[in-house]
């Protein structure tokens, strides 16, 4: 099966595993998926992730994070820029997710980063997803 949007697939797998409170999930690896997983870890939305080398493209194992009474840390994930409708924003026009409580993941000329980091570096780019 040909996958037309691997980022949407990643977000959907995280959302589904999070909904049923799985401890971890695995997905096919790519450079952009590793960068997104690193952002989610750095911002405290997941516990950890690891890259597992195999004979094909590799696998990313993501360890989900839950609160003390098993409440979800990730309450929402939304894909913004899709293959059929790309969404770009200048540095000054980058969206604030839930008034700063969430993050926007942005692909810029300086790499994949959060909306806050892109504003600090004064770069715009493609708005990939919102996480809150």
From Swiss-Prot:
PROSITE patterns: RIBOSOMAL_S8 (PS00053). The keyword S-adenosyl-L-methionine does not apply. One of its GO terms (biological process) is translation. Disulfide bonds: none annotated. SUPFAM superfamilies: Ribosomal protein S8 (SSF56047). One of the primary rRNA binding proteins, it binds directly to 16S rRNA central domain where it helps coordinate assembly of the platform of the 30S subunit. This is Small ribosomal subunit protein uS8. It comes from Halalkalibacterium halodurans (strain ATCC BAA-125 / DSM 18197 / FERM 7344 / JCM 9153 / C-125) (Bacillus halodurans).
């Amino acid at each position: 099966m040909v996958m037309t949007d691997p980022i949407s697939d990643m977000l959907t797998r995280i959302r589904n595993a999070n909904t049923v409170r799985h401890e971890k999930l695995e997905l096919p690896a790519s450079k952009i998926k590793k960068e997104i997983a690193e952002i989610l870890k750095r911002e405290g939305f997941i516990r950890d992730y690891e890259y597992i080398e195999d004979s094909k493209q590799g696998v990313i194992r993501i360890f989900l994070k839950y609160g003390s009474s098993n409440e979800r840390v990730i309450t929402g994930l939304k894909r913004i820029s899709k293959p059929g409708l790309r969404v770009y924003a200048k540095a000054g026009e980058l969206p604030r997710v839930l008034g700063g409580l969430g993050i926007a993941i942005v692909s810029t000329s300086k790499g994949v980063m959060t909306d806050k980091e892109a504003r600090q570096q004064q770069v715009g780019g493609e708005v990939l997803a919102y996480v809150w």
